[in-house]
Amino acid sequence: MKIRSPIVSVLGHVDHGKTTLLDYIRGSTIAAKEAGGITQHIGATEIPNDTIENICGDFISKLAIKDLIPGLFFIDTPGHAAFTSLRKRGGALADLAVLILDVNDGFKPQTYEALNILKMYKTPFIVVANKIDRLFGWEVHEGASFRETFSNQAKSVQQDLDNKIYEIVGELHKEGFQSERFDRVSNFASQISIIPISAKTGEGVIEVLAMLLGLAQEYLTEQLEIDENAPAKGTVLEIKEETGLGVTLDAIIYDGVLRTNDEIALMLSSEDVLVTKIRSILRPLPLEEMRDSKKKFRKLDEVVAAAGIKVAAPHLDDVVSGSPLRVLSEDTDVEQEILNEIDNITIDTEDEGILVKADTIGSLEAVVKLLREMDIPIRAADIGDVNRRDIINSSIAYDENELHGAIIAFNVDVHPNSEEDLNNSEVKLFSGDVIYQILEEYEEWVKQKQEDKKKSFYDAIIKPAKFVSLPKLVFRQSKPAIIGIESLSGTLKQGQQLINKDGHVVGSIASMEDKGETLPDISRGQRVAMAIKDAIVGKDFEEGDELYVDIPEKHYKYIEREFKDKLTEDEFETLYEFLEIKRKQDSDWGSFGLFE
């Protein structure tokens, strides 16, 4: 069995140096002009073992790395959006990952998100603490190993870096990982290695390459074994139009061999399987050749994993990014394999919930997994831009439950023809390219909606209140009774039903006035003239009596269960006076049943 190069993905927060690191690795290997050099693939860069050994020198021999691993295969598109898009059955396509962070900036939202995604896919990784050249007092040693450059720094600079490394160790510990600076790691199987580097000056990059090679050799050789004669397995990166070629697909082949004229099976956006024949397999020309040629690609008869290639074939328009790619063979029902994989990918949805849209299968799976962990129901989940059908579907969900009238859109846009539909609907769109932030915004929105709903509900509930009928201030005895009152607790509102101290209904508040002004409600301590519909002074109550707002039993239970802490002290006292009055008539009034 042949061992292929491990596929390496670089993740981290924006501006923390993902692209700079990849550019430096490519640049230094091209500049080295060693035998074999680098191979530029579609969407990836392969650095052979010989080149790494020549760059790393003695460091490789110190790690006792043998020539088991042919090289390192770096995915060119950095970031976790690319990481989740590149998937294979059972997890991420990347065998190893580099989590990069700015040593001066520490953990940022996308760092945590990348860490969660690595955790989700159980991908082995190293942490690269970048931008050591920005530490105060740092003396740059271009391209040097970390050990060499670190030993030439002032003690204060060394201490400063150590402090920052231990802050990273602390954050990783909070996230459930044991870690240490790479040269202090005692067990590479249980501790994450932190490598301080400068992607700009190249300091420490030697150790990054050597550590990746060493980890792959020590822990991944079995999963890197491939049968170079077996039908190819791969993952589609993207579908794109190329001048002179028509619609093509870019793919990473991670197992087996792919040949021109092979029949391949792919997944369509309709969740059907496309079988098509490869017309040509293409790889970019080396940079130096590209300058002297009008062509961008070189045609190949075959490629063996790991390889990043462009495929020209008929009918690729509706193939999905992230789709599995399989070569048809007599031994295996590949079409059924793809259908099985589609079944695994197809997201189980509920009758109610929010809508989820993403750019690729892998991204969709990652977003849905995170939503499931948050116990958020999903009505529909699909790949592609937000369209009119999505907005209609989400509007229906809103009518059933306004918290479900939301669309989570990761790395996709709203279709231009649907923007007006969205603006005219009640649907709330949460979109962006950082899953962590989108979900945080959604949670905040849900929380606010729930608080608003609770407040509206609380405002609508009849709450405890009472007043006293002031002596010698009876302006009319009945039809309606008009009396002078003083509010003793709570808020009295027009229309509220009133009871006396015996629990009998005396009537309802028709109106309240003060100095000729009609008042819809009054608070404790206010004195007003009150008209009480259906009440007769002297029969239903006397001057000087206290009257209570009549609270429906259902409202009392809501207050008791959910809103008791919102009552003022005087409202609280009035509630229990009112309860005593009610229980003189019915001892079970306000009691909770077994299932309440």
UniProtKB/Swiss-Prot annotation:
Residues 130-133 are annotated as: G4. Residues 76-79 are annotated as: G3. Keywords: GTP-binding, Initiation factor, Nucleotide-binding, Protein biosynthesis. Belongs to the TRAFAC class translation factor GTPase superfamily. Classic translation factor GTPase family. IF-2 subfamily. GO terms for molecular function: GTP binding; GTPase activity; translation initiation factor activity. Pfam families: GTP_EFTU, GTP_EFTU_D4, IF-2. Residues 37-41 are annotated as: G2. Residues 12-19 are annotated as: G1. Residues 198-200 are annotated as: G5. Coiled coil: none annotated. NCBIfam families: aIF-2, PRK04004.1, small_GTP. Function in general translation initiation by promoting the binding of the formylmethionine-tRNA to ribosomes. Seems to function along with eIF-2. GO terms for cellular component: cytoplasm. This is Probable translation initiation factor IF-2. InterPro entries: EFTU-type, P-loop_NTPase, Small_GTP-bd, T_Tr_GTP-bd_dom, TF_aIF-2_arc, TIF_IF2, TIF_IF2_dom3, TIF_IF2_dom3_sf. GTP binds at residues 12-19, 76-80, 130-133. Residues 3-220 form the tr-type G domain.
